[in-house]
Amino acid sequence: MKALALLSGGFDSPVAIYLMKNKLEIDALHFSLEPFTNDIPEKKSIELCKKLGIKNLYVINHSREHEEIVNKCDHRYYYVISRRLMYKVAEELAKKLNCDYLLDGCNIGQVSSQTLSNLSVITQAINIPILR
């Protein structure tokens, strides 16, 4: 079984990878927001993959889409719309890589996109199971 892990460079996603790496083959995906942010999250993701033994890290620049969402969407829904888009992109890559799951280090209730109702809306955008 294989999973594509969404790796932000934060705390929760590497914990999810660590917990599942002995059960699944895992590739990782990082969404870069350069030039809106610096390259620190990308560098952290590269370093985390090395430490966790993840051989394949895919980096997708998401800055153009991020800018569109910020400029055109109701800001109350920013996180939900952004996550839905990232999940759709991740699902497409997961299909190409023959992954069975997406792996997300979601910490339920931590931020607005991670409430149960918002997670439900986000998850409806894709057809691949998500391990959280």
Predicted features along the sequence, with ranges:
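Short, ordered loop/turn segments at secondary-structure junctions
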Residues: 31-34, 62-63, 106-108
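A general structural motif
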Residues: 7-13, 58, 83-86, 112-113
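Short, well-ordered alpha-helices that flank and scaffold nucleotide-derived cofactor binding pockets
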Residues: 18-22, 50, 92
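Active-site adenylate/phosphate-handling loop in enzymes that bind or generate adenylated species
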Residues: 66, 75-132
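Structural beta-sheet core signal
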Residues: 5, 28-30, 59, 104, ...
